[in-house]
């Protein structure tokens, strides 16, 4: 025995006897597992004495070390750090250098192996490879801890030679699979895949019987299947299916085939805040928004509308699944160490390559500074090793925002179209495995992003220098479209690096057109001044946006069907004609006429290519947020106030009984409700509500009392729903769903941007509350949403007005030029805005007092 071994033996003995003390002094709660009779057998050192006396604090499980993991959602018992493992690790290197061959295994003869253990061990060996100097793993690690009283003479090194312990922490950090967890997963997968066809068919029928809003009830939904499998399922043009995005939790991917090429479109899930305590889910697809995925599919299949402008792909033939979702997940997304060829395997090892359906692992919760601390996956120390931290980070997917795609379109930063080649970078292991894993088309994908703990995304400058970067996946191979938002690969990689395409290549030519629209005007003007006309404009020169200085409303040259060339303000015959036209149709028809005129004025509809070139943007909703869109903002302010005044004149001009005025009030309330709910026109909804809330109308007590008596439902609708909703809109707390909006509520934003030109109409919502700064910030934040979804408003307006046959007379009544001529005459319509509004406020006050004179205090 060497001198070092003697010192180690003395330290070991001192720890055994001095650290634990006398066994008789132990409390009864720490009594030995065996009776005191077993202590008399100290001289017997047979290797098959498994029932040895062991201390409760260092006891390890009997069978293979099946430590529970938080990702498996099993019990967390037994995951505490073992103090004996640290000691065993220090002497393991010395033992391997001294001994050339392994000692006999200390396996108790009376404990049988659990079923399927050999198969699980074979899978583990295939995944990790054999170790040359380490003996085979024994299924009984409990022989490591031997009672210190029974073997005081045996050196520590000899005991550890006979039963080499496993360093649980090191092999978990290195990404090696555990035998126990593989055994559990193998059994679970085998149980699912070995189900009888009758059982699978019955389970599929139960899924298809669910509610139609439940995605599982539709056969074209295939769950978590790999990208390659989905491409093989769509065989003909028009075939399509919906699957889960394997990297963006909660998102979906529409896979279809068009022009003999498989295309993938990502469906983003966003949370829309509709109030302080109410939120709902929206699914954004291209420039459209839907309440649920089945509505998206019904819309595109029923209308045969192309899913994207770039590809022109049309879907009409669903590819139905023939197995339940549980079976598909077991086939492609559950097995870690399974020997089935379809089981996905991570390139960086089986550990951490799969994610449970409703949970995320600790890697997804890392912040950027934690991820960039280390270079390699196995040797990373940025992650805390105790499993308690993993338990705390295994949160529900519904409780955290998506880390891979923005949850709101407001936070999206558009990718530069000038970079069309996307290089996907995956973290690779620091050392190659002893046994090479077979390449599989499914092994590249997995249900969890392939960023192992501590892998660091390299910067653009050093990304290509590393020896372990994986092959690049260009965007052009995934789809022919240059649109990054529509054709980004939803299933591979954690981060991407944009590489500029080579000038003259096909990718460069395809992206030049879209890049001109995305770049700022300053960059394009600078390029024009330095290099002349850009080559990517296909022979066209850059057109500077036109800064409009004159209003689009010109009452003097307005050609009318109802108004003569020269008219006076508030002509009685003209007012009677307008009242008759408004009474002939119902509130919904009026709302459609109003919405059509609004969308034409705001340039949501009827925008030609020439108009887009002159504006510099595609839609008016984006123009009104820009500096050169000032005239559009002023025109919308003019239209808002003119519309409110005309409706107020229509009510106050009713000189009949209070019942007639109450009926007219009721129809006006119905018009506001139709504009809000059916048409999604928040602009005219606010204008109609502004007319009802005018002081000259709200003071008509007899009219409102009659309304509550004769039209109770209208009065309740106005007081309980419409007024609170408008208040929430003005305070920036609530808004309609994007899928139902044709004209957003932009009046507060316009008032903020044009505060010097906006006519005073009472206190602003941000000036009469203590939360004024929050209200202003909410409206400025909403401006980003308005500018971003201009195409969505255009699509919604087209859908709601599809097949609508408008009457020219009603369209003229709701046009701004007609209203200006009606209210101020042919000459007064050209006067200044402030003067017109000031005079007409006095006219409305006079009409109101004529209907219901003010009660004098002496008459009370």
From Swiss-Prot:
* UniProt-annotated stretches for the region Disordered: 51-117, 130-180, 335-537
Q: What GO CC annotations are associated with the protein?
A: axon; cytosol; ruffle membrane
Q: Where are the compositionally biased (Basic and acidic residues) regions?
A: 162-175
| Residue span(s) of domain Ras-GEF | 586-854
How does this protein sit in the membrane? Peripheral membrane protein
- Listed as disulfide-bonded, the cysteine pairs are none
Q: Give the SH2 domain ranges.
A: 220-319
Phosphotyrosine sites (modified residues): 278, 283, 793
- An example molecular function term from Gene Ontology annotations: guanyl-nucleotide exchange factor activity
Question: What keywords would UniProt list here?
Answer: Cell membrane, Cell projection, Cytoplasm, Membrane, Phosphoprotein, SH2 domain
**What's the record's remark on domains?**
The C-terminal Cdc25-homology/Ras-GEF domain adopts a closed conformation rendering it incapable of carrying out canonical exchange factor function, this closed conformation is required for interaction with BCAR1.
The protein's name in its UniProt record: SH2 domain-containing protein 3C
């Amino acid at each position: 025995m060497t001198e070092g071994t003697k010192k180690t033996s003395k330290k070991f003995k001192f720890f055994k006897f001095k650290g634990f003390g006398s066994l008789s002094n132990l409390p009864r709660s720490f009594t030995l597992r065996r009776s005191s009779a077993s202590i008399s057998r100290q001289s017997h050192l047979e290797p098959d004495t498994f029932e040895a006396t062991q201390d409760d604090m260092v006891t390890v499980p009997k069978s293979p070390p099946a430590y529970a993991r938080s990702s498996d959602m099993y019990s967390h018992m037994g995951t505490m750090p073992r103090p004996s493992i640290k000691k065993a690790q220090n002497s393991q290197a010395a033992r391997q250098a001294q001994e050339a061959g392994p000692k006999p295994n200390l396996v108790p003869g009376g404990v049988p192996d659990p079923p399927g253990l050999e198969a699980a061990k074979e899978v583990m060996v295939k995944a990790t490879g054999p170790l040359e100097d380490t003996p085979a793993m024994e299924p009984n690690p409990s022989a490591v801890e031997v009672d210190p009283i029974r073997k005081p003479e045996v050196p520590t090194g000899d005991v550890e030679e006979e039963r080499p312990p496993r360093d649980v922490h090191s092999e978990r950090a290195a990404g090696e699979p555990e035998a126990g967890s593989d055994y559990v997963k193998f059994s679970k997968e085998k149980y699912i895949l070995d189900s009888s066809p009758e059982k699978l068919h019955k389970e599929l029928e139960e899924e298809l019987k669910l509610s139609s809003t439940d995605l599982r009830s539709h056969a074209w939904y295939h769950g978590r299947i790999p990208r390659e499998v989905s491409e093989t399922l769509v065989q003909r043009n028009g075939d399509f299916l919906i699957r889960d995005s394997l990297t963006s939790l909660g998102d979906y991917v529409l896979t279809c085939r068009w022009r003999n090429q498989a295309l993938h479109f990502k469906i983003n899930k966003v949370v829309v805040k509709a109030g302080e305590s109410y939120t709902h889910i929206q699914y954004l697809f291209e420039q459209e928004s839907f309440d649920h995925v089945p509505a998206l599919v019904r819309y595109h299949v029923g209308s045969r509308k192309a899913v994207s402008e770039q590809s022109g792909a049309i879907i009409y033939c669903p590819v139905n699944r023939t197995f339940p979702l549980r079976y598909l997940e077991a086939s492609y997304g559950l097995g870690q160490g399974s020997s089935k060829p379809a089981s996905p395997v991570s390139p960086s090892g089986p550990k951490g390559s799969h994610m449970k359906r409703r949970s995320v692992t600790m890697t997804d919760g890392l912040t950027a500074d934690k991820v960039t601390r280390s270079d390699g996956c196995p040797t990373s120390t940025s992650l805390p090793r105790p499993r308690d931290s993993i338990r705390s980070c295994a949160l529900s997917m519904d409780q955290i925002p998506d880390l891979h795609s923005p949850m709101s379109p407001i936070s999206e930063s558009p990718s530069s179209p000038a970079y069309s080649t996307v290089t996907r970078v995956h973290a690779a292991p620091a050392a190659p495995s002893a046994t090479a894993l077979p390449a599989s088309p499914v092994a590249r994908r997995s249900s969890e992003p392939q960023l192992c703990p501590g892998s660091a995304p390299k910067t653009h400058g050093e990304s290509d220098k590393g020896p372990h970067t994986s092959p690049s996946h260009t965007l052009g191979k995934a789809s022919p479209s240059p649109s990054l938002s529509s054709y980004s690969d939803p299933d591979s990689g954690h981060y991407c690096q944009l590489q500029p395409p080579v000038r003259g290549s096909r990718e460069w030519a395809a992206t030049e057109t879209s890049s001109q629209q995305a770049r700022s005007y300053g960059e394009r003007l600078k390029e024009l001044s330095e290099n002349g006309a850009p080559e990517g404009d296909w022979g066209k020169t850059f057109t500077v946006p036109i800064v409009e200085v004159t209003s689009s409303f010109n009452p003097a040259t307005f050609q009318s069907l109802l108004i003569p060339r020269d008219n006076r303000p508030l002509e009685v015959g003209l007012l009677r004609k307008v009242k008759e036209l408004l009474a002939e149709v119902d509130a919904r028809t009026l709302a459609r006429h109003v919405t059509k005129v609004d969308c034409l004025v705001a340039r949501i509809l009827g925008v030609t290519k020439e108009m887009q070139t002159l504006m510099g943007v595609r839609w008016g909703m984006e123009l009104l947020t820009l500096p050169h869109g000032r005239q559009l903002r002023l025109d919308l302010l003019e239209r808002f106030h003119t519309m409110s005044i005309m409706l107020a004149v229509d009510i106050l001009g009713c000189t009949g009984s209070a019942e007639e005025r109450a009926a007219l009030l009721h129809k006006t309330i119905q018009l506001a409700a139709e504009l809000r709910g059916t048409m999604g026109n928040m602009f005219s909804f606010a204008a109609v509500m502004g007319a009802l809330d005018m002081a000259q109308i709200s003071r008509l007590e007899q009219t409102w009392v009659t309304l509550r008596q004769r039209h109770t439902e209208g009065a309740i609708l106005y007081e309980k729903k419409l007024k609170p909703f408008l208040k929430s809109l003005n305070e920036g707390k609530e808004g309609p769903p994007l899928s139902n909006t044709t004209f957003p509520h932009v009046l507060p934003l316009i008032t903020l941007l044009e505060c010097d030109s906006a006519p005073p109409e009472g206190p602003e919502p941000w000036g009469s509350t203590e939360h004024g700064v929050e209200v202003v910030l909410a409206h400025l934040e909403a401006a980003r949403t308005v500018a971003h979804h201009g195409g969505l408003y255009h699509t919604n307006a087209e859908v709601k007005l599809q097949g609508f046959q408008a009457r020219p007379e009603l369209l003229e009544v709701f046009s701004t030029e007609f209203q200006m001529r009606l209210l101020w005459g042919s000459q007064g319509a050209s006067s200044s805005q402030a003067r017109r509004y000031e005079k007409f406020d006095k006219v409305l006050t006079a009409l109101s007092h004529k209907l219901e004179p003010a009660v004098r205090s002496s008459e009370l």
